[in-house]
């Protein structure tokens, strides 16, 4: 499936009205002070935002904008309808807004799978490592997942976050096994995708690999255009709480060739849509044009 520029731009704009406003936007810091932050392109010192720095600088440089609003971090932005650039939107939250941008790309779009191996050389196993991330300890899906499957599959935490200090009674020391390399993941066929604060940072490179993602229907919208991923075509679907993981794995092991085909489709989705730098830059510029003018109709763009 090859996505057109129009499809992707419309997807990234999301909740925004394509004919959003008939006049240029009036960015009022008083209205948005408690929500995103504003980058003043004339003051480079304000560009310091941890892992987001290179992407923020790129967006500022690609368009003649004096100011751009960003909402960084992992909590979906739910503010007013201003064209704020965000990393993700939450489909479970109707108030989740923003124009999707390719933020924190160094983490989410490092597609280095140079150490990948052929499907038939991979272990017929499930493998997962990650931190116990999550803003809300009581909805932390990763803790439930490791608690349920630690004794059956090679799933464990690589690190404990601040949640461990606030609720240590939810954890077991044996669940912590330390950091694993990407190569460790790629030795296995079946790689679960578990959301953290927002989307899993591993989804993109796992799709690009010869392994197959096992995941619920995507909750978060991002630069990846998750709505265009099809269950049984690009990934193998499980229930949101992974309660049917073992049943799904039984099917996978009985349908090895179909699983390999799904893995190839995922890799093709990535290679066809997100690896051409000219296309990526063109789409970014189109989004910035929408923000600058406040009046943008993608159907009239060549």
Regions found by a protein language model. Name each.
Residues 1-181:
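Secretory-pathway glycan-assembly enzymes, especially type II membrane glycosyltransferases
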Residues 179-302:
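Catalytic binding pocket for nucleotide-activated donors in carbohydrate/polymer assembly enzymes
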């Amino acid at each position: 499936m090859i996505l057109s520029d129009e499809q992707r731009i419309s997807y990234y704009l999301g909740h925004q009205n394509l004919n959003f406003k008939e006049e240029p936007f009036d960015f009022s810091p008083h209205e948005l002070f408690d929500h995103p932050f504003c980058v003043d392109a004339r003051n480079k010192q304000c560009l310091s935002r941890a892992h987001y720095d290179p992407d923020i600088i790129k967006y500022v440089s690609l368009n003649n904008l004096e100011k751009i609003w960003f909402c960084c971090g992992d909590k979906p932005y739910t503010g007013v309808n201003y064209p704020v650039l965000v990393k993700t939107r939450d489909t479970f939250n109707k108030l989740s807004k923003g124009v999707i941008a390719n933020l924190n790309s160094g983490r989410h779009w490092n597609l280095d799978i140079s150490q990948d191996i052929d499907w038939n050389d991979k272990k017929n196993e499930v493998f997962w490592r990650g931190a116990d991330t999550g803003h809300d300890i009581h909805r932390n899906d990763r803790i439930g997942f490791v608690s349920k499957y630690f004794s059956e599959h090679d799933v464990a935490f690589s690190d404990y976050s601040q949640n461990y200090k606030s609720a240590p009674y939810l954890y077991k020391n044996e669940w912590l096994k330390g950091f694993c390399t990407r190569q460790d993941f790629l030795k296995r066929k079946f790689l679960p995708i578990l959301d953290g604060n927002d989307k899993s940072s591993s989804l993109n490179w796992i799709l690009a690999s010869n392994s197959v993602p096992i995941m619920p229907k995507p909750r978060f919208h991002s630069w990846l255009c998750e709505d265009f991923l099809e269950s049984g075509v690009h990934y193998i679907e499980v229930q949101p709480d992974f309660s049917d993981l073992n049943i799904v794995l039984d099917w996978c092991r009985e349908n090895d060739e179909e699983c390999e085909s799904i893995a190839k489709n995922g890799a093709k989705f990535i290679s066809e849509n997100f690896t051409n730098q000219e296309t990526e830059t063109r789409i970014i510029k189109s989004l910035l044009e929408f923000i600058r003018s406040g009046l943008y109709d993608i159907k009239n763009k060549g």
